[in-house]
UniProtKB/Swiss-Prot annotation:
Family membership noted in the UniProt record: Belongs to the trans-sulfuration enzymes family.
Gene this chain is encoded by: metI
Induction profile: Up-regulated at the transcriptional level when sulfate, cysteine, cystathionine or homocysteine are the sulfur sources. Repressed by methionine.
Chief localization: cytoplasm
Naturally occurring in which organism (per UniProt): Bacillus subtilis (strain 168)
Family annotation (Gene3D superfamilies): Aspartate Aminotransferase, domain 1 (3.90.1150.10), Type I PLP-dependent aspartate aminotransferase-like (Major domain) (3.40.640.10)
Protein name: Cystathionine gamma-synthase/O-acetylhomoserine (thiol)-lyase
Length: 373
């Protein structure tokens, strides 16, 4: 029976133990599992390879994304690192130009050393994308919407091109989650989540998830996961399951607030522009003057100046010195991540309270009431 995403989320782990009938999934902390004899495994041998609690999370995300197999990692970057093990020296990937700084750092500072080449594209021009495809191209890696400029890519359109050329299509779905977007249904082969963000939702765990479209690729990814070993621990797996149960409710409030806050910010004369695709809980905006950035951040009382996103609390991040600091300044600014840009992870607080906080901070900055030091 096909179920709605809200039901899938609420039911995660609820029938995991038929012996006791426990509703809340157990946390299996054991690192090893007893065998009755040679070749008589229970299916669980060693915690790095497989763990019952982690298995529930992996099955849940595969079910939510309608994929063949899910895999849980110790962080979003560990998930991407393990995906990169699919490639070898000489391979080329085409990647979103407006990319999370941590992913850019991994590609440019780590994987280039092993002979991989990365070409950057905003995926707005089909001819431009096609021109970057060479005989060595193996995959296209897309963030949609991008971090932090909130640019959406047409996954279906890109998928038609990747299939035409026999390329893998990898999509980072962190910002939209399976509630708002399911890339495998649109033609992607691999989906990534930094589950630290919306899926966990409470700023209290570090996790990454991957879902693959077919079992063959899933088995290959599992072998890399087992070999590299950056797996999600049992307790963090349980925390993630607990957070995911309320994902749909939280995303609804994140989105409602973000829509209201985006409209509010567009009316403020201290703001030059607002970047919001119309859905989801993430937006970015630029202040009129660079020198206003630090005083504005200092003046906030409810909204937290912090480097993360997707939690129930509202966060504002300064990409230039936080998430994107490892991208060379000339490249960062050319891509649109200027020194006036702020990224806003809109929480689930009352929208009027968030407006009041923004309003008083902007007012203080404009009137010079906050120290510029």
């Amino acid at each position: 029976m096909s179920q709605h995403v809200e039901t899938k989320l609420a039911q995660i782990g609820n029938r995991s133990d038929e012996v006791t009938g426990t509703v809340s999934a157990p946390i299996y902390l054991s690192t090893a599992y007893r065998h009755r004899g040679i070749g008589e495994s229970t299916g669980f041998d060693y915690v790095r390879t497989k763990n019952p609690t982690r298995q529930l999370v992996e099955d849940a995300i595969a079910n939510l994304e309608n994929g063949a197999r899910g895999l849980a990692f110790s962080s979003g970057m560990a998930a991407i690192q393990t995906i990169m093990a699919l490639f070898k020296s000489g391979d080329e990937l085409i990647v979103s130009s407006d990319l999370y700084g941590g992913t850019y750092r991994l590609f440019e500072n780590e994987w280039k050393k092993y002979g991989l080449t990365f070409h950057y594209d905003d995926f707005s021009d089909e001819d431009c994308l096609r021109s970057k495809i060479t005989p060595n191209t193996k995959a296209v890696f897309v963030e949609t919407p991008t971090n932090p400029l909130m640019q959406e890519a047409d996954i279906e359109h890109i998928a038609r091109i990747t299939k035409e050329h026999g390329l893998l299509l990898i999509v980072d779905n962190t910002f939209y989650t399976p509630v708002l977007q399911r890339p495998l249904e649109l033609g992607a082969d691999i989906v990534i989540h930094s589950a630290t963000k919306y899926l966990g939702g409470h700023n209290d765990l570090l996790a990454g998830l991957v879902v693959v479209k077919d079992e063959r690729l899933g088995e290959e990814m599992f072998q890399h996961q087992n070999a590299i070993g950056a797996v999600l621990p049992p307790f963090d797996s349980w925390l993630l399951m607990r957070g995911m149960k309320t994902l749909s409710l939280r995303m609804r409030q994140h989105q409602a607030n973000a829509q209201e806050l985006a409209a509010f910010l567009e009316e403020q004369e201290e703001i030059s522009d607002v970047l919001y695709p119309g859905k989801g809980g993430m937006l970015s905006f630029r202040l009129q003057k660079e020198e206003w950035v630090n005083p504005f951040l200092k003046a906030l009382k409810t909204i937290c100046f912090a480097e993360s996103l997707g939690g129930v609390e509202s966060f504002i991040t300064y990409p230039a010195t936080q998430t994107h600091m490892d991208i060379p300044e000339e490249i960062r600014i050319a891509n649109g991540v200027c020194n006036r840009l702020l990224r806003f992870s809109v929480g689930i607080e009352h929208a009027e309270d968030l407006k009041e906080d923004l309003k008083q901070a902007l007012c203080q900055v404009k009137e010079g009431a906050v120290s510029f030091e």
